[in-house]
Amino acid sequence: MYSFLFKYIIIGDTGVGKSCLLLQFTDKRFQPVHDLTIGVEFGARMITIDNKAIKLQIWDTAGQESFRSITRSYYRGSAGALLVYDITRRDTFNHLTCWLKDARSYANSNMTIILIGNKSDMESKRAVSYEEGRQFADENGLIFLETSAKTASNVEEAFVNTASKIYEKIQKGDFDINNESFGIKLGAPTSKQDGTDQKPAGGGCCK
């Protein structure tokens, strides 16, 4: 059982490592070659915040323009979004404004968004500086982390920090937690240790 269920969506261009981040978080493993995500795929895991069991239900979306309308339908009913770019591909960073505009147009206004610069293990091929990522996040009111789905660096933190922010908003009364359109569902008021459950399907990590 869980105290709360939080729904997440992972967004960003094709090939930035969205599916790899999900797999690393739910299964603690890295799969370098995936088929492209077609539409939307799913994973879930339990975490603990403030001694409360929280289930994260995570939707991994396709980055291709042809699937954008499907992705948009998943913004509604999401409490958190991971907006991902690839630090070795500047075009994926340049497209963030478009992704963010979509998120803020179609999601509820209280959705927590974290900006993730993925593939931090590929420092020698870096095309976007840490400072640029931080500046974009600061200017747009986002949480910011650089991650590596390959080494697992900051992957746990990305998902958990987002959940902590959502939980903080619940404590402040920013959400009507009885309205599931905010991406939050009440469970049983019990506490639980960290664990894992459903495995995600593969997809969409690499071009």
From Swiss-Prot:
Q: Where is the lipid attached (S-geranylgeranyl cysteine)?
A: C205, C206
What InterPro entries does the record tag this protein with? Answer: P-loop_NTPase (IPR027417), Rab_GTPases_membrane_traffic (IPR050209), Small_GTP-bd (IPR005225), Small_GTPase (IPR001806)
Tell me the segments the record calls region Disordered.
Answer: 187-207
Entry EC no(s) = 3.6.5.2
- What family does this belong to? Belongs to the small GTPase superfamily. Rab family.
Organism of derivation: Dictyostelium discoideum (Social amoeba)
Recorded superkingdom = Eukaryota
Keyword list (alphabetical) reads: Cell membrane, GTP-binding, Hydrolase, Lipoprotein, Membrane, Nucleotide-binding, Prenylation
Protein's name according to its UniProt entry: Ras-related protein Rab-2A
Gene this protein is translated from: rab2A
Q: Where in the cell is it found?
A: Cell membrane
Principal subcellular localization: membrane
What is the recorded membrane topology of this protein? Lipid-anchor
Question: PROSITE patterns, per this entry?
Answer: RAB (PS51419)
